[in-house]
């Protein structure tokens, strides 16, 4: 099992798919990295030799990935919350940001339903 950028990459998968296990690398960027490192896209990770792994590590080091990318994203969200813009307020209150309706759906953002007492029983 190869270890690139602190992530154990599955050895039985093709190189392109295996590199997508790294946070911040999608399929297109994985293809780009393999081309820079001059490694075949169809080659499985278990067939990579040490020179190829080293070349891939060098190519990956130019990108913001894993912890560095996660911290940047969280700092961006924190900045939005601090300046008090619309998106920041929606982040703070745990609601959808991009104009979706919230009357019926958005259960993922709002969490589990909170039941309200029955109005008929409450008035008696």
Swiss-Prot record:
<dbReference type="GO" id="GO:0015935">
    <property type="term" value="C:small ribosomal subunit"/>
</dbReference>
<dbReference type="InterPro" id="IPR010979">
    <property type="entry name" value="Ribosomal_uS13-like_H2TH"/>
</dbReference>
<feature type="region of interest" description="Disordered">
    <location>
        <begin position="94"/>
        <end position="124"/>
    </location>
</feature>
<keyword id="KW-0820">tRNA-binding</keyword>
<dbReference type="Pfam" id="PF00416">
    <property type="entry name" value="Ribosomal_S13"/>
</dbReference>
<feature type="compositionally biased region" description="Basic residues">
    <location>
        <begin position="100"/>
        <end position="124"/>
    </location>
</feature>
<dbReference type="GO" id="GO:0019843">
    <property type="term" value="F:rRNA binding"/>
</dbReference>
<dbReference type="GO" id="GO:0006412">
    <property type="term" value="P:translation"/>
</dbReference>
<dbReference type="InterPro" id="IPR001892">
    <property type="entry name" value="Ribosomal_uS13"/>
</dbReference>
<dbReference type="InterPro" id="IPR019980">
    <property type="entry name" value="Ribosomal_uS13_bac-type"/>
</dbReference>
<dbReference type="GO" id="GO:0000049">
    <property type="term" value="F:tRNA binding"/>
</dbReference>
<comment type="subunit">
    <text>Part of the 30S ribosomal subunit. Forms a loose heterodimer with protein S19. Forms two bridges to the 50S subunit in the 70S ribosome.</text>
</comment>
<dbReference type="GO" id="GO:0005829">
    <property type="term" value="C:cytosol"/>
</dbReference>
<keyword id="KW-0699">rRNA-binding</keyword>
<keyword id="KW-0689">Ribosomal protein</keyword>
<dbReference type="InterPro" id="IPR027437">
    <property type="entry name" value="Rbsml_uS13_C"/>
</dbReference>
<comment type="similarity">
    <text>Belongs to the universal ribosomal protein uS13 family.</text>
</comment>
<comment type="function">
    <text>Located at the top of the head of the 30S subunit, it contacts several helices of the 16S rRNA. In the 70S ribosome it contacts the 23S rRNA (bridge B1a) and protein L5 of the 50S subunit (bridge B1b), connecting the 2 subunits; these bridges are implicated in subunit movement. Contacts the tRNAs in the A and P-sites.</text>
</comment>
<dbReference type="GO" id="GO:0003735">
    <property type="term" value="F:structural constituent of ribosome"/>
</dbReference>
<protein>
    <recommendedName>
        <fullName>Small ribosomal subunit protein uS13</fullName>
    </recommendedName>
</protein>
<keyword id="KW-0694">RNA-binding</keyword>
<keyword id="KW-0687">Ribonucleoprotein</keyword>
<dbReference type="InterPro" id="IPR018269">
    <property type="entry name" value="Ribosomal_uS13_CS"/>
</dbReference>
